[in-house]
Swiss-Prot record:
Compositional bias segments (type: Basic residues): 211-226, 316-333
Compositionally biased spans, kind Low complexity: 21-36
Basic and acidic residues bias locations: 347-361, 370-399, 990-1003
The keyword Cytoplasm is assigned to this record: yes
Encoding gene (name): Gprasp1
Composition bias, Polar residues: 461-484
Pfam families: Arm_2
Summary of the function given for this chain in its UniProt record: Modulates lysosomal sorting and functional down-regulation of a variety of G-protein coupled receptors. Targets receptors for degradation in lysosomes via its interaction with BECN2.
InterPro entries named in the record: ARM-rpt_dom, ARM-type_fold, GASP1-3
Name used for this protein in its record: G-protein coupled receptor-associated sorting protein 1
Tissue expr: Expressed in the brain.
Similarity remark: Belongs to the GPRASP family.
Organism: Rattus norvegicus (Rat)
Disulphide bonds in the chain: none
């Protein structure tokens, strides 16, 4: 900000030397020797500085007080003063006015005991360190209006400078409240500290700002590692406070400065003036960390509490109010690790902080990208000091440095919502801001909650981050790349933009331990932009290591990728931020998807785990790439990257990659995390990877088993998507066992739909049966994005990677499958068998809410006893329509290959509802497996597989028309496959064999009677649908068959059959008619329904049809519209196209296109093109595209290949009349090409004009534009015979249209032009054309004659 803008009270004197106190207060240093400021700075000002001079601050405060809120630093030491503003007064600062007088008043009011202030814990004698929250003016207003004064007081804290001891506090300085819309163009804050000078300013709108542009962040790195001398400068003596508030207009160099300020020794105040969101910066000196500590906390645990401005402030009060404690550091008084405190000698300095979430793209994600930012070295001494008793809150200026500032800017309303979410916590748990953790914390954010409860006092509690933006406002997280790199000694490294130790007694004192943590939270104006939390607490090497990192990215309307890399250079027990928890760690509840890599090796091994959360809204795709590598370990653990893809109605999309590695001895102790509340499971798409070390027997990470205690040590990851009954179809799980040793894997997935939680497998069943046995099981389903409430399908990958074993398949059972049983309860068990077996087989399909027309509507959402069959693959037969059967035979051959065989009983239309599938595989015999399933007829099909490669099916009356085979490793994408039998090698069962010629229909009677049209036709003699002939050819084909086309009688299903059995007529029924038809089909018996309309053929259900209509309204992609038109019968399509759409699923296909990056890019391009093309603003997307192609074609070089390509495309587009009106506007250009182009160019132009001449209206336009003369010129030029023939065809079309006598009668608007058309020249031209035609014919005959 320029000096001019700075108000008198806010201006800092540039002339002050670095040695002086804060520039604002420097000049009045002699004048205000005693400046009293409450330890808790309740400056509620929304970012406006008092217009009064610093000296004019609320009055001199005793030297003992921290600092004057007015912006003047007092030289006094920071000591806790029981002064706090009254709850009501604290809040009432007028955002725009905030004068020194009011501050002084507030200061007086603050004389009230600290207990009154929500920031000060009543119990703690020492006042928690003052936090300076810079709240936007508007937010303050909002808060004052909407938030109880008590609650909002914390939010309104003006960035006030820390106590003298804290020496220079970096504080964001804003000259005056700035309206939300106004960017802080002029305000830049540069904090000149010695070497560590960092300045940060955030222009919300300004990309140049350091934090906003991600690129700029590089130099800044939020965590700038500072040399010890820098640290000293930071912990500079209070006399030397060099707190420069340099007001300058936004300059790049300043932007490059680090975005945070830290008090050298004292709590650093960070008030960021981020304008748009409430920006709460909170600083905590390590002793004062507990400023946020809940007032109700007896122990005065030092817990950092962050609260966000706006509603957040109240959030703090609210959650705490509930508990009676603002933010309670749940840890006992004895355990006094300051959450954020970093103790350190003067030389040691922790720099931490960071962030602004500027705009959606925000800097923080950007800054995160830089590796250096977060690094900060912290000596062990500091770590120990962290754990110092809270009672010793007296400032240790030299030793301690403020370590991080946590800044969250959010919009007021988003904060409020977030806070309300917080309130979901259990009564006894305090919620602090969006972020908090507490020892017995049971609270979970309604959107996201992580509960960490230490089992014992000595255990530290993992940090808990609650923050979900506005439920829907939070979209995809901005791209954040965070890399934590220890920069200090190997043994002592603190990495993290934000670090805290929850439990005081967390043995941070161990010398070899380092704590890394980074927490980033950024929020955009309208929604949380992103949040990253990294919390590490590390007990001594002897104790369990706990690392927590939580990454959360949420961004408004932007697709972002989050990538976190955590690498540990320290060979000692270093823990990396990405979040994870150690074995002994109390179970943590994660409300969100984690991508976790756990490596619990020797105690000195670092545990690296990234946890990313991508929260996506409104069909935003968030891709999370989590990579963690430890350098002391030979093999880096890379957690799988997953992208969360979300459909518009999906609330969240999240991906989960989970990779646990545990020591053999601790494998069973693996921590289990779950979130209790179903609402906490927004994941829609997960990918789970479980890697076991050579020695570990079991790994037991459970993700989100909300109802189930973590009673088992069985490796299991629970994945399910439960968000509003919407499940992403991308769910997938992959489990890799690099070791041959026996492990127990149990991956459970269940959908959390509505209020019910479905447990796919029984936990008890997944117990290891023998030491040598390996049980691998995971349930997965890929549900179509958000279409069906529960997970409908299971796509499961269990990959076993021993050298001798190979598993292939999107779905398959692990290396030694002894048996798989399909039980209606939805449980199955796989018992390991031969090690060397190779099980190959895959089957994949996507499900729709209602799959299949007729009997096959499958909705795996509802899990009634009679419906859901969970087996190696899950088919839930929906209500009346029972799935005929799912059969899986996993048969290891002698050489170790098991081939799954799926048998689907015959025609669905005649399927009996009584089918139960049993799949048995006996690896011991290796010789045969019997698969039984209820066939559509009374008879049963018995499939015997001799050594897995022999399959014969026998049916009575050939119930299965044709077998469908696929290899085990091949995926089939049919939603509801037709009768299927998979045989390994038997040629006689192969679909390649032609049907017996004797079975071919010999007449139309046989065809129409024996093969009634049905909703599906597959192998064997195809049903009638595959044969589609034009109406004009029907009689011709009838004569060829020796009969007349036979009409099909109207069936009892109230649906008339098509006139010609081989004819496909698109149905142009209205939406209302289609709805009625689909309802009638659902109400009818599936066996009796027979209809070959396009909706029935594509198996579109009522719900799917409604969703299709919504997608057409919300999307403008021309390709998606074409697919929708085909599905609605408005466009004809080839059989291949219809089969493809049916097999893929209409909604699944459209959703895939909507989420496919190139599709989105194309759609964006076309939308931009429309905006940039005012000449045709009323055209739809495809018409706009046609216009663009025409214009580009004329711009290309004459006769060039690009021009020919454009002409060819336009010719194809004009085969239908839809785009004639668009193309005809460019006739002049086409005539030019007709005269100037070569023979090939003229050929393509003439073909285009031939298409136009087939339309009456276009024929009229051709005549008006005098196209006849152009054609005659070509006659005279003696063009090629091909071109002459096309011209003659055009004349023939024109002649036919003229004879219809409707040519000039249709359009009354152009009567004048009609009158202008003179038919005499046309008649002469036609006669001349006729002469040319005769001559051409004669020439052709001469060539043919010998």
């Amino acid at each position: 900000m320029t000096g001019a803008e700075v108000e008198p009270g806010a201006q800092a004197k540039a002339e002050n030397k670095p040695g002086d106190e804060n520039a604002n207060a420097a000049e009045v240093e002699p004048e205000v020797p005693l400046v009293v400021r409450p330890k808790v700075r309740t400056q509620m000002m929304t970012g406006a500085r008092p217009k009064v001079k610093p000296k004019g601050t609320p009055g001199a405060r005793p030297k003992g007080e921290t600092s004057s809120p007015g912006g003047a630093y007092a030289k006094c030491k920071p000591r806790s003063i029981p002064i706090s503003r009254s709850k009501h007064d604290a809040q009432v600062w007028a955002p725009s006015k905030f004068r020194g007088e009011s501050m002084s008043k507030m200061g007086k009011q603050c004389q009230i005991s600290a207990a009154d202030s929500p920031l000060v814990s009543n119990d703690s004698g020492a006042v928690a360190q003052a936090k300076c929250l810079s709240v936007d003016r508007e937010l303050a207003n909002m808060d004052t209006e909407s938030i109880p004064k008590k609650a909002s007081s914390p939010a309104r804290f003006q960035p006030s400078f820390g106590p003298e001891e804290g020496t220079s506090m970096g504080s964001w300085y804003r000259p005056r409240p700035i309206p939300k819309g106004e960017a802080y163009e002029n305000s830049d804050f540069k904090w000149a500290d010695k070497s560590s000078g960092s300045s940060s300013f955030w222009n919300r709108d300004e990309t140049s700002t350091r934090f906003r542009p991600r690129k700029s962040m590089k130099s800044n790195t939020r965590f700038r590692h500072m040399a010890k001398q820098e640290a000293n400068t930071m912990s500079r003596h209070k006399n030397k406070q060099e707190f420069y508030n340099i007001s300058s207009s936004d300059s790049e160099d300043e932007s490059a400065k680090t975005p945070w300020f830290w008090a050298k020794d004292k709590p650093k105040v960070w008030s960021r003036p981020k304008e748009e969101p409430n920006t709460r910066s909170w600083f905590r000196s390590k002793k004062e960390v507990r400023v946020e500590s809940t007032s109700g906390s007896e122990c005065e645990n030092h817990t950092k509490s962050l609260f966000w401005s706006g509603e957040e402030a109240k959030c703090r009060s609210k959650p705490r109010a509930r508990k009676g404690v603002n933010m309670r550091a749940r840890h006992q008084a004895k355990r006094e690790a300051y959450s954020d405190v970093t103790s350190g000698s003067v030389d040691k300095n922790k720099k931490d902080s960071w962030f602004l979430p500027e705009e959606k793209a925000n800097a923080f994600s950007k800054s995160k990208t830089k590796k250096e930012p977060r690094t900060r070295a912290m000596p062990r001494e500091e770590v120990k000091t962290k754990a110092r008793a809270s009672t010793k809150q007296e400032a240790r200026p030299e030793e301690e440095v403020l370590v991080g500032a946590w800044v969250l800017d959010t919009q007021d309303n988003t904060m409020g919502e977030r806070i309300s979410m917080k309130t979901t916590c259990v009564e006894e748990e305090p919620i602090v801001g969006d972020w908090f953790w507490s020892e017995e914390e049971a609270s979970v954010d309604s959107e996201t909650g992580l509960k960490s409860r230490p089992r014992a006092k000595e255990e530290q509690v993992s940090s808990f981050c609650l923050g979900s933006g506005k439920k829907t406002s939070m979209e995809s997280g901005p791209k954040a790349t965070s890399k934590s790199m220890p920069v200090a000694k190997d043994d002592e490294v603190i990495i993290g933009s934000w670090f805290w130790a929850d439990d005081e007694e967390i043995s941070l004192q161990a010398d070899d331990e380092s704590i890394f943590g980074s927490w980033f939270w950024g929020t955009g104006e309208k929604s949380l932009r992103s949040v990253g939390v990294s919390c590490e607490k590390m007990p001594k090497s002897g104790e369990k290591e706990v690392t927590d990192s939580w990454f959360w990215a949420g961004e408004v309307n932007t697709e972002a990728e989050m990538e976190e890399q955590a690498s540990s250079a320290s060979t000692k027990g270093t823990i990396f931020v990405p979040w994870f928890w150690s074995e002994k760690q109390a179970h943590m509840d994660l409300g969100t998807e984690p991508c976790s890599d756990i490596m619990a090796g020797a105690e000195e091994e670092p545990i690296i785990g990234p946890w990313f959360w991508a929260k996506v809204d409104n069909s935003v795709e968030a891709e999370v790439n989590s990579k963690s590598s430890l350098e002391d370990e030979e093999e880096p653990i890379r957690s799988p990257w997953f992208g969360a893809r979300e459909q518009p109605n999906m609330k969240y999309a999240a991906g989960v990659g989970y990779k646990p590695m545990a020591e053999a001895e601790e494998a069973n102790k693996k921590s289990c995390v779950w979130a209790k509340e179903p609402c906490l499971y927004p994941t829609n798409r997960e990918s789970l990877k479980s890697t076991l070390g050579e020695k570990e027997d079991t790994v037991d990470p459970w993700l989100w088993s909300n109802n189930y205690p973590r009673t088992e040590t069985i490796t299991g990851s629970w994945l399910w998507a439960a968000e509003e009954g919407n499940i992403d179809d991308e769910t997938g799980e992959e489990i890799k066992l690099p070791t041959l040793e026996d492990n127990v894997f149990n991956s459970w997935s269940w959908k959390e739909n509505e209020e019910t939680v479905v447990e796919a497998p029984n936990r008890e069943e997944s117990k290891p049966e023998a030491e040598e046995e390996d049980i691998i099981g995971s349930w997965f389903w890929a549900g179509d994005e958000d279409r069906f409430q529960p997970a409908a399908k299971i796509k499961e990958e269990n990959k076993i990677a021993p050298e001798d074993e190979d598993t292939v398949g999107s779905w398959f059972w692990g290396k030694e499958e002894a048996s798989v049983e399909a039980v209606k309860g939805g449980t199955f068990e796989s018992v390991s068998g031969i090690k060397e077996e190779k099980a190959t087989g895959s089957w994949f399909w996507t499900d729709k809410a209602k799959i299949g027309a007729g009997p096959q509507t499958v909705e795996t959402g509802s899990e009634t006893e009679d419906e859901a069959i969970f087996e190696s693959l899950i088919w839930a037969a929906k209500k009346d329509s029972m799935q005929t059967g799912v059969n899986r035979v996993s048969k290891p051959k002698d050489e170790g290959e098991g081939i799954e065989s799926w048998l689907w009983s015959g025609d669905k239309a005649t399927t009996e509802s009584k089918t139960v599938t049993v799949s048995e595989s006996s690896p011991e015999n290796g010789k045969e497996s019997i698969v039984k399933f209820g066939s559509r007829a009374k008879d049963e099909v018995i499939n015997k597989t001799g050594s897995g490669d022999n399959c014969k099916f026998s049916t009575e009356a050939e119930s299965i028309v044709g077998p469908w085979f696929w290899e085990g490793d091949e995926a089939s994408f049919e939603s509801n496959p037709v009768p299927v039998c998979k045989a390994a090698c038997e040629p006689e069962s192969s679909t390649e064999h032609e049907p017996d010629p004797s079975r071919r229909p010999q007449s139309w009677d046989e065809v129409t009677v024996q093969f009634k049209p049905g909703p599906w036709g597959k192998a064997g003699f195809p049903s009638l649908n595959p044969f589609r002939f034009p109406k004009e050819a029907a009689s011709l084909f009838a004569e060829m068959f020796g009969g007349k086309p036979k009409l099909v009688e109207v069936g009892t299903e109230r649906e008339p059959e098509p006139q010609f059995p081989f004819q496909y007529d698109p149905s142009y029924r209205s939406v209302r008619e289609i709805r009625e038809h689909l309802k009638a089909r659902e109400s009818a018996q599936a066996e009796n329904w027979s209809c070959n309309c396009i909706q029935c053929e594509l198996r579109i259900g009522s719900e799917e049809f409604e969703e299709l209509l919504l997608m057409m309204d919300r999307n403008r992609d021309p390709f998606i519209h074409e697919i929708s038109k085909i599905a609605m019968g408005m466009r004809g399509a080839s059989q291949f196209t219809r089969d493809f759409i049916r097999n893929s699923g209409v909604i699944s296909l459209i959703e895939a296109l909507m989420n496919y990056p190139s599709s989105r890019a194309r759609t964006a391009f076309l939308e931009n093109m429309i905006q940039m093309a005012p000449t045709y603003p009323d055209l739809n997307m495809i018409e706009t595209y046609v216009c663009q192609v025409c214009e580009d074609t004329f711009d290309y070089d004459l006769d060039s290949s690009d021009q020919l390509s454009g002409l060819t495309m336009i010719t194809h587009l004009t085969t239908t009349f839809d785009y004639h009106k668009v193309v005809v506007a460019y006739l002049a250009g086409f005539y030019y090409l007709l005269n100037s182009g070569n023979t090939t160019t003229r050929f393509h132009v003439l073909k285009l004009l031939l298409n136009l001449s087939e339309s009456l209206v276009m024929t009229k336009r051709l005549l008006i534009t005098d196209s006849v003369s152009e054609f005659m010129a070509l006659f005279n030029r003696e063009d090629s015979d091909e071109n002459i023939q096309i011209i003659l065809a055009i004349f023939e079309n024109i002649s036919k249209n003229i004879q219809k006598e409707a040519l000039f009668a249709d359009d009354e608007e152009e009567e004048e032009e009609e009158e202008a058309v003179n038919l005499e020249p046309l008649i002469s031209a036609f006669r001349e054309a006729e002469k040319f035609a005769k001559e051409l014919k004669r020439k052709t005959d001469d060539q043919k004659s010998p």
